């Protein structure tokens, strides 16, 4: 029996898988402690699943014909060993598969990519700046390795960069965009960092992120993906 810790489900979204009507399954647990994380209730690995995976399957069964896709988000979905089986069961029901990931586990991502139709990869900073943001040593290198696996796979994808004035000033952001281009990344979307209810209460206001748009090339602004509501 597939074991997947689920922290919440969004039954319908139009923005988490471009061009598709999708449900989002928020997987519990994340190995990183990103300062601007707003889904802090999804960080602990030890919490019991808020929704049993069979209940999620029942929900998806009832929504066949109404939805095009299911997106596995988090937390960090690749943390969970049950994710491949959950993806297989969902695909068997006729849904396309989307995946939101920060690239924490490159090898696991590489193994999953043949079963995935679209990936939203959160790329947070220049690799050498990751430790100050995630609190995890080697996280930048793992994210870059995941990007390379993703590009090599040919799976359609979007790179999402969260912009905060203090964490990613214009010069660092432009360097990051150039790095992503050098590695063959697809569309790069910038999303404004929202500082309410984040993991680090001392992060401070994000006053003028739109100024970055005028200074940085090859990227667009987006409203960002859904947050988990626990429903």
Segments (PLM) and residue ranges:
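A secondary-structure boundary/capping signal
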Residues: 26, 73-74
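Conserved AdoMet/S-adenosylmethionine-binding subsite of the radical SAM
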Residues: 57-62, 66-69, 78-203
């Amino acid at each position: 029996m597939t074991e997947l810790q689920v922290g919440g489900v969004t039954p319908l979204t139009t923005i988490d898988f471009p061009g598709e009507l999708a449900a989002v399954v928020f997987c519990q647990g994340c190995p990183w402690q990103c300062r601007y994380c707003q889904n802090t209730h999804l960080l602990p690995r030890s919490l019991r699943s808020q929704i049993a995976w069979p209940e999620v399957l029942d929900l998806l069964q009832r929504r066949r014909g109404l939805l095009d896709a299911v997106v596995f988000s988090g937390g960090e979905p690749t943390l969970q060993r049950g994710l491949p089986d959950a993806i297989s069961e969902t695909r068997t029901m006729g849904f396309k598969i989307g995946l939101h990931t920060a690239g924490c586990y490159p090898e696991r991502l590489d193994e999953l990519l043949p079963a995935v139709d679209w990936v939203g990869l959160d790329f947070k900073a220049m690799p050498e700046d990751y430790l100050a943001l995630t609190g995890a040593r080697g996280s930048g290198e793992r994210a870059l390795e995941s990007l390379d696996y993703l590009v090599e796979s040919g799976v359609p994808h979007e790179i999402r960069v969260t912009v905060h004035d203090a964490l990613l000033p214009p010069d660092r952001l432009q360097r990051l965009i150039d790095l992503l281009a050098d590695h063959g990344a697809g569309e790069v979307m910038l999303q404004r960092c929202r500082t309410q209810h984040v993991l680090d209460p001392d992060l401070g206001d994000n006053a003028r992120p739109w100024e970055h748009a005028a200074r940085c090339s090859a990227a667009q602004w987006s409203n960002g993906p859904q947050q988990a509501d626990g429903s």
